[in-house]
Amino acid sequence: MVREPVKIQGTKEGLVIVVDEDVDIEVLKERIVDRIEKSLKFFEGATLNVRVKNSKFKDEELEDLKDFILKNYGVEIFIKKFQEKHIKNVTDDEIFNGLEEGITKFHRGTVRSGQVVKYYGNLVIIGDVNPGGLVQAAGNIVVTGTLRGIAHAGFTGNKEAFIVASSLKAMQLRIANIISRAPDKEEEVEYPEIAVVRKNKIIVRPLYHLSDLW
């Protein structure tokens, strides 16, 4: 089997590009650009970890690479050395499992009808999600305002993910492959709520009742 000099791996830190020894800086640049251009919406406003065990890269080469990616794609890159044994290789479908901690994207502003915000980590919406808006996260979803659209947490299959909103009025809730909708309420509630999976069903509880859930 031919060894892949530039590998895309998933860790609890999120998406990581692992660079083997003797990789040319231009090859690294091409692979990063190729990956970003295939998933522009995913990388929007995100950060990318690049782990290298190649000491021949000059500092100015790495800085030029970081500046190029940030300027042209708006993606911030963090580069550091690594020891390969510390990186766990997983499949793309398992790319994010860190629910207690891990990479988090903050989306500022209202998610409007027809708009999709998707992230392979935890997702925080600083604003509302309007009817017809869709937010998706491999991890947890937190909406600081009113959630009226569709929220899909743990979309890679993680049933431990949760959805929190200051006002939960969702058209539909999804956690992993389980689908539900926010329950109809006889009267408006004035407290945040959390949706979790219990016994293979999505349940919604007041956020202050966390002790009943865990």
Swiss-Prot record:
GO terms for biological process: cell morphogenesis; division septum assembly; regulation of cell division; regulation of cell septum assembly. Disulfide bonds: none annotated. InterPro entries: CAP/MinC_C (IPR016098), MinC (IPR013033), MinC_C_sf (IPR036145), MinC_N (IPR007874), Septum_form_inhib_MinC_C (IPR005526). SUPFAM superfamilies: Cell-division inhibitor MinC, C-terminal domain. It holds the Pfam family MinC_N. Keywords: Cell cycle, Cell division, Septation. Interacts with MinD and FtsZ. HAMAP family: MinC (MF_00267). Belongs to the MinC family. Cell division inhibitor that blocks the formation of polar Z ring septums. Rapidly oscillates between the poles of the cell to destabilize FtsZ filaments that have formed before they mature into polar Z rings. Prevents FtsZ polymerization. This is Probable septum site-determining protein MinC. It comes from Caldanaerobacter subterraneus subsp. tengcongensis (strain DSM 15242 / JCM 11007 / NBRC 100824 / MB4) (Thermoanaerobacter tengcongensis). The lineage of its organism: Bacteria, Bacillati, Bacillota, Clostridia, Thermoanaerobacterales.
